[in-house]
């Protein structure tokens, strides 16, 4: 989007700003962990953890909004949060173990949202820069996984899969861009509640 919209100047301005550059790098690290952990869950048959993470995330996003941004909720909203927390706790109790990976996935996205809100950089520019900063590491990980093989091998080096990998980036860019644009003017608590619209 940045090259297409001619926003190189804005991107360069953000990259030159030490504080904003740190925010963008941190955002890139947290979203990379979030997606990497989600993919690991799916690839290793831990689908419950992957699904549970997206029920935990809204609660954590609301708490981050309350603690970091001093957002206030009404009594009815706190009651809704408590009901959601009870709904999330039920499968944890039934499973008999603490879903650490699910909590980390949910927490990483809540922190990602807080970073994007604090940075207050236009959505297209921030998504472009965070992707740019973590791309070398991501490409290195893909290469290592391919060379080693195993259950989390992506199978993308060579053939038509090599074409699909960049296209997957295009498809996943749009939701991140929209989220990045929206979180600048939306409270963390409202964004957390809206996360329950997500398919899990």
Identify the function of each model-found stretch:
Residues 1-3, 97-150:
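Transmembrane alpha-helical segments that form core, pore/gating elements
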């Amino acid at each position: 989007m940045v090259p297409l919209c001619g926003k190189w100047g804005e991107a360069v301005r953000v990259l030159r700003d030490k504080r904003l550059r740190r925010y963008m790098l941190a955002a890139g690290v947290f979203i990379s962990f979030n997606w990497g952990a989600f993919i690991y869950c799916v690839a290793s048959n831990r689908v419950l953890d992957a699904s549970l993470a997206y029920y935990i995330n809204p609660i954590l996003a609301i708490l981050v909004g309350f603690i970091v941004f001093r957002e206030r909720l009404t009594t009815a909203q706190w009651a809704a949060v408590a009901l959601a927390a009870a709904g999330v706790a039920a499968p944890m109790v039934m499973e008999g173990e603490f879903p650490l990976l699910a909590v980390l996935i949910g927490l990483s996205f809540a922190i990602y949202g807080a970073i994007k809100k604090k940075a207050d950089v236009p959505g297209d520019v921030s998504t472009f820069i965070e992707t740019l900063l973590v791309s070398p590491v991501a490409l290195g990980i893909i290469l290592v996984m391919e060379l080693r093989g195993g259950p989390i091998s992506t199978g993308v080096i060579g053939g038509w899969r090599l074409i699909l990998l960049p296209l997957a980036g295009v498809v996943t860019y749009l939701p991140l861009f929209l989220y990045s644009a929206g979180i600048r003017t939306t409270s963390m608590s409202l964004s957390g509640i809206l996360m329950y619209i997500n398919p899990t």
